[in-house]
C-alpha cells in the first residue's frame, strides 16, 4: 500500500492475524487494492466509562489499520446509548440519558487514546446524535422496511428471549438500524466489532446497499475471556483488567490469568510471532505469565502503547528474551517495582502500600470485635457468614497468621493487617 511499504496482500495478511471472521474477506482485499485510505468505523455506547483489555482487542486492530495509513472513525453512541444495545443481553438494558452517555464518553475517549493514534488524518471522533436525532419518522419507516420481524428473531439473543418468553421491547429492534445508519452517515468501508456484534454489522451492509453505498466489510474480533476463565471480560462480572490500572495492580492481575487462556492473551493482546508464543508456552506457565505481565504492564504504563507489543519492545525494556528469566535490573522502574511487590506477596510477604479502613468504636465491645464482622467491615468479605466459611477453610489471615477460630474476638488497640487469599490486604485501625 502507498506509503506503508506493504502490498495489499501483505496488509491483508497482517490484518487477518487474530481476526475471528472478515465478511467478506475478498471485498476487504479489493478495497485495499484501491490504494486510498479506508474509513474504519467502531461504534461505542459508553454505558460504562472504563475500558479494559477486552476493549483493547478491537482497538489494537484499529491501531493496526492506522499504521497502514487508514482512518479510524470512533462513533460515540450518545443517541443509541439511550436505547441500549441488546447484543448478548438476556434482558432489556436500562437506557441512559444523553447527559450520562456524554459524560461517560469523555473517559472512554481519553482511555481509547492510549491505543489509537489521534492525528487528524488517522482519527475522527463523531457522536451519532449528529444524524440520528434529526431523523424523520418517514426515514425510520424506510429503515425498518429493509428487514422482517422473522429476520430479527433469527438473531441469537432475541431468539433465546422470545423462546423463553422474556419480553423484547420494540425499541430494541430499532438498535441495529440505528447502528447501520451510522455506517451510512460516515460512508464506512469497514466496521469493527466483537463476534457478538455480527448481526448488527451485517445489517449495516444491507442498509448501505439500500442507500446506494458500497457495503462495508464486517471485521469481527474474538471476545477476550476474563480472569474467571469462563465469561467474556466485563467490569460487571469483576473479571477484568482495566487499561488504566496502576502497574502493580495490572501486573498482579496478569499473573492470575488462567493457564489455558495464555495462548489467546498472547495472540490477541501482543504482536509476538507464533513461534515465539509457542516457545513461551513450552517453557511453562510461570515464565509465560511473567513475559505477558511485563509486556502489557510496560506498554499500558506509557501515555500511548507502542505500535507493536513484540519481542523487540520486550528487549527494548532491557529484558533478555532467550532466558525468559528474572533480570532485577531490567525493565522500567514501575514494572520492576510491580514485579518485586508481586514476588514479595507470593512469598508470603505484605505489600508496602495497602488500603486502610477505620473501624468505628461503636463496633467494639470491651475493646474487641468479632473477627468475621471485622473482615466484612474491611470489605474483604461480603457477609459475616462468608467470613466464617473462609476461616473454616483457612482462607483468611490476621497479621500473617492463618485464622482457624471463626468466633475469635480481635483486639484493635493497634493497627492489624487482614488478608484474603494471596494478594488481598487491608490495614484496619480504630477511628479517632
From Swiss-Prot:
Family: Belongs to the class-I aminoacyl-tRNA synthetase family. TyrS type 2 subfamily.
Main EC class the enzyme belongs to: ligase
Reaction(s) catalysed by this chain's protein: tRNA(Tyr) + L-tyrosine + ATP = L-tyrosyl-tRNA(Tyr) + AMP + diphosphate + H(+)
PANTHER family cross-referenced by the UniProt entry: TYROSINE--TRNA LIGASE, TYROSYL-TRNA SYNTHETASE
Anything else known: Although this protein is a class I aminoacyl-tRNA synthetase, it displays a class II mode of tRNA recognition.
Presence of the UniProt keyword Aminoacyl-tRNA synthetase in the record: yes
Top-level taxon of the source organism: Bacteria
Keyword Protein biosynthesis among record annotations: yes
Signal peptide: none
EC number(s) reported in the record: 6.1.1.1
Single GO molecular function: RNA binding
Name of the protein in its database record: Tyrosine--tRNA ligase
SUPFAM superfamilies, per the entry: Alpha-L RNA-binding motif, Nucleotidylyl transferase
GO annotation, cellular component aspect: cytosol
Subunit description: Homodimer.
Record domain S4 RNA-binding: where: 369-430
Annotated residues for binding of ATP: 235
One Pfam entry name: tRNA-synt_1b
Subcellular location field: Cytoplasm
Keywords: Aminoacyl-tRNA synthetase, ATP-binding, Cytoplasm, Ligase, Nucleotide-binding, Protein biosynthesis, RNA-binding
Residue positions of motif 'KMSKS' region: 232-236
Motif ('HIGH' region): 46-55
GO BP terms: tyrosyl-tRNA aminoacylation
Function field: Catalyzes the attachment of tyrosine to tRNA(Tyr) in a two-step reaction: tyrosine is first activated by ATP to form Tyr-AMP and then transferred to the acceptor end of tRNA(Tyr).
Xref: NCBIfam families: tyrS
Location (main, coarse): cytoplasm
Amino acid at each position: 500500500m502507498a506509503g506503508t511499504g506493504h502490498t495489499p496482500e501483505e496488509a491483508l495478511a497482517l490484518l487477518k492475524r487474530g481476526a475471528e471472521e472478515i465478511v467478506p474477506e475478498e471485498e476487504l482485499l479489493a478495497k485495499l487494492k484501491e490504494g486510498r485510505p479506508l474509513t474504519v468505523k467502531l461504534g461505542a455506547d459508553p454505558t460504562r466509562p472504563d475500558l479494559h483489555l477486552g476493549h483493547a482487542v478491537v482497538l489494537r486492530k484499529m491501531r493496526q489499520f492506522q499504521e497502514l495509513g487508514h482512518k479510524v472513525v470512533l462513533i460515540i453512541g450518545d443517541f443509541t446509548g439511550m436505547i441500549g444495545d441488546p447484543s448478548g443481553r438476556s434482558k432489556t438494558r436500562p437506557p441512559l440519558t444523553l447527559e450520562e452517555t456524554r459524560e461517560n464518553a469523555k473517559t472512554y475517549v481519553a482511555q481509547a487514546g492510549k491505543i489509537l493514534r489521534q492525528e487528524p488524518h488517522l482519527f475522527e471522533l463523531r457522536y451519532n446524535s449528529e444524524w440520528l436525532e434529526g431523523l424523520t419518522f418517514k426515514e425510520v419507516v424506510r429503515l425498518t422496511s429493509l428487514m422482517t420481524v422473522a429476520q430479527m428473531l433469527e438473531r441469537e439473543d432475541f431468539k433465546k428471549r422470545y423462546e423463553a418468553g422474556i419480553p423484547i421491547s420494540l425499541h430494541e429492534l430499532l438498535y441495529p438500524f440505528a447502528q447501520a445508519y451510522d455506517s451510512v452517515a460516515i460512508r464506512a468501508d469497514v466496521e469493527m466489532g466483537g463476534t457478538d456484534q455480527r448481526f448488527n454489522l451485517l445489517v449495516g451492509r444491507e442498509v448501505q446497499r439500500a442507500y446506494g453505498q458500497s457495503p462495508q466489510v464486517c471485521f469481527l474480533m474474538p471476545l477476550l475471556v476474563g480472569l474467571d476463565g469462563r465469561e467474556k471480560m466485563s467490569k460487571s462480572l469483576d473479571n477484568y483488567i482495566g487499561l488504566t490500572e496502576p502497574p502493580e495492580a495490572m501486573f498482579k492481575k496478569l499473573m492470575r490469568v488462567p493457564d489455558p487462556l495464555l495462548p489467546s492473551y498472547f495472540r490477541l493482546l501482543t504482536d509476538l510471532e507464533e513461534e515465539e508464543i509457542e516457545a513461551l508456552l513450552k517453557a511453562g506457565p510461570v515464565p509465560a505469565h511473567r513475559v505477558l505481565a511485563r509486556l502489557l504492564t510496560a506498554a499500558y504504563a506509557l501515555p500511548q502503547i507502542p505500535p507493536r507489543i513484540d519481542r523487540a519492545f520486550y528487549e527494548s525494556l532491557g529484558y533478555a528474551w532467550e532466558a525468559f528469566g528474572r533480570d532485577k535490573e531490567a525493565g522500567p522502574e514501575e514494572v520492576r517495582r510491580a514485579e518485586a511487590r508481586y514476588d514479595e506477596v507470593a512469598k508470603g510477604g505484605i505489600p508496602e502500600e495497602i488500603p486502610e479502613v477505620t473501624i468505628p468504636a461503636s463496633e467494639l465491645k470491651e475493646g474487641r470485635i468479632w473477627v468475621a464482622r471485622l473482615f466484612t467491615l474491611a470489605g474483604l468479605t461480603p457477609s459475616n457468614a462468608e467470613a466464617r466459611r473462609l476461616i473454616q477453610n483457612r482462607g483468611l489471615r490476621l497479621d500473617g497468621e492463618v485464622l482457624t477460630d471463626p468466633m475469635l474476638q480481635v483486639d484493635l488497640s493497634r493497627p492489624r493487617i487482614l488478608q484474603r487469599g494471596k494478594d488481598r490486604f487491608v490495614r484496619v485501625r480504630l477511628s479517632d
